[in-house]
Amino acid sequence: MAVATSVATPVPTPAYSAGRAPAKEKKIYLPDTLAEWPWPRAINPHYAEAKEESQAWAASFNAFSPKAQHAFNRCDFNLLASLAYPLATKHGCRSGCDLMNLFFVIDEYSDIAPVEEVRQQKDIVMDALRNPHKPRPEGEWVGGEVARQFWALTITNASAQSQKHFIETFDEYLDSVVQQAEDRSESRIRDIQSYIDVRRNTIGAKPSFALLELDMDLPDEVLAHPTIQSLSLATIDMLCLGNDIVSYNLEQARGDASHNIITIVMNELNLDVNGAMRWVGDFHKQLEKQFFEAFNNLPKWGNAELDAQIAVYCDGLGNWVRANDQWSFESERYFGARGLEIMETKTLAMMPIQRTEALGPQLVDDSIL
């Protein structure tokens, strides 16, 4: 489900001019981005069963140390999938869980790997996805087998169109992961617009949206329609902003916040952390308007079945925004055991920098680096 880069999301005019704060800022105030978002929390009824299966499956690869695997499990990426695909079948829910686990295996390994190694990881994963029934070479990086098994199970009950869209967009996602590694190796901090252009792919939203259409047959021209494109792009950008807002504190503590909109805005507009948070909150409001302008004017194709599928698909995009936000606070990924409290107060303490080169998520101050 490729989203054309010709559909532009305007970057808002700077509204804040406060100078950069001292390096050790006491409190971070999160913007309440979804205060008026109409999609309520919904969860797939197969969550518990799919989580048990997918968590055991992910652990079976021994991709992380036991300590890191424990922290990984506390992130509960299966919850994210079950919130994101509340209407999916048991098979669809399991595929969603497996995909989220695959994403984070790729993320954790690529975050600490040199650029050339990340390129090799990309080639391994794409070869596995394109050849899901071909055994992986002995001694190969574990991500190849994780990807192969995920896709071999998923395609047993997936339409040809959804498979096509997934492969295309996962390739784009991995290209952006390589680009992120290049930026990191060069200590490059992008400007706002070029960062957004890259972040739209590193978030992994496009292949995630392909799982919304596993039981649909959406033609390419439907997904390429300007209104659907605008809707998809607004959704992706809201997911990017939402994720960067909640992950910033941990990323800056890890010394790896260069690929985060908060850092980008602070650097370009000379704002402190909370000035950047407010700026991003205002940007999010613009994206909400873009989303609803498209959502309330969906095209009709004169085919009742296709129109119904489009309606369900687009409703799924709106739900994805809520799902990502809920998971961010309900899991222990970003806020440890204090997620629900922080969801209410929107306030947290700035963590001190605690760099780690260890592979996999690490427990620090009851949160997960």
From Swiss-Prot:
<dbReference type="Pfam" id="PF19086">
    <property type="entry name" value="Terpene_syn_C_2"/>
</dbReference>
<feature type="binding site">
    <location>
        <position position="243"/>
    </location>
    <ligand>
        <name>Mg(2+) 3</name>
    </ligand>
</feature>
<comment type="similarity">
    <text>Belongs to the terpene synthase family.</text>
</comment>
<dbReference type="GO" id="GO:0008299">
    <property type="term" value="P:isoprenoid biosynthetic process"/>
</dbReference>
<feature type="binding site">
    <location>
        <position position="251"/>
    </location>
    <ligand>
        <name>Mg(2+) 3</name>
    </ligand>
</feature>
<dbReference type="GO" id="GO:0010333">
    <property type="term" value="F:terpene synthase activity"/>
</dbReference>
<keyword id="KW-0106">Calcium</keyword>
<feature type="short sequence motif" description="NSE motif">
    <location>
        <begin position="243"/>
        <end position="251"/>
    </location>
</feature>
<protein>
    <recommendedName>
        <fullName>Delta(6)-protoilludene synthase STEHIDRAFT_73029</fullName>
        <ecNumber>4.2.3.-</ecNumber>
        <ecNumber>4.2.3.135</ecNumber>
        <ecNumber>4.2.3.198</ecNumber>
    </recommendedName>
</protein>
<dbReference type="InterPro" id="IPR034686">
    <property type="entry name" value="Terpene_cyclase-like_2"/>
</dbReference>
<feature type="binding site">
    <location>
        <position position="107"/>
    </location>
    <ligand>
        <name>Mg(2+) 1</name>
    </ligand>
</feature>
<keyword id="KW-0460">Magnesium</keyword>
<feature type="binding site">
    <location>
        <position position="247"/>
    </location>
    <ligand>
        <name>Mg(2+) 3</name>
    </ligand>
</feature>
<keyword id="KW-0464">Manganese</keyword>
<feature type="short sequence motif" description="D(D/E)XX(D/E) motif">
    <location>
        <begin position="107"/>
        <end position="111"/>
    </location>
</feature>
<keyword id="KW-0479">Metal-binding</keyword>
<keyword id="KW-0456">Lyase</keyword>
<dbReference type="GO" id="GO:0046872">
    <property type="term" value="F:metal ion binding"/>
</dbReference>
<keyword id="KW-0170">Cobalt</keyword>
<dbReference type="InterPro" id="IPR008949">
    <property type="entry name" value="Isoprenoid_synthase_dom_sf"/>
</dbReference>
<feature type="binding site">
    <location>
        <position position="333"/>
    </location>
    <ligand>
        <name>(2E,6E)-farnesyl diphosphate</name>
    </ligand>
</feature>
<comment type="function">
    <text>Terpene cyclase that catalyzes the cyclization of farnesyl diphosphate (FPP) to delta(6)-protoilludene. In presence of Ca(2+), a significant switch from 1,11 to a dual 1,11/1,10 cyclization occurs, producing beta-elemene as the major product, with lower levels of delta(6)-protoilludene and (E)-beta-caryophyllene, and traces of beta-selinene and alpha-selinene.</text>
</comment>
<keyword id="KW-0533">Nickel</keyword>
<feature type="binding site">
    <location>
        <position position="107"/>
    </location>
    <ligand>
        <name>Mg(2+) 2</name>
    </ligand>
</feature>
<feature type="site" description="Plays a critical role in the stabilization of intermediate cation">
    <location>
        <position position="104"/>
    </location>
</feature>
<feature type="binding site">
    <location>
        <position position="334"/>
    </location>
    <ligand>
        <name>(2E,6E)-farnesyl diphosphate</name>
    </ligand>
</feature>
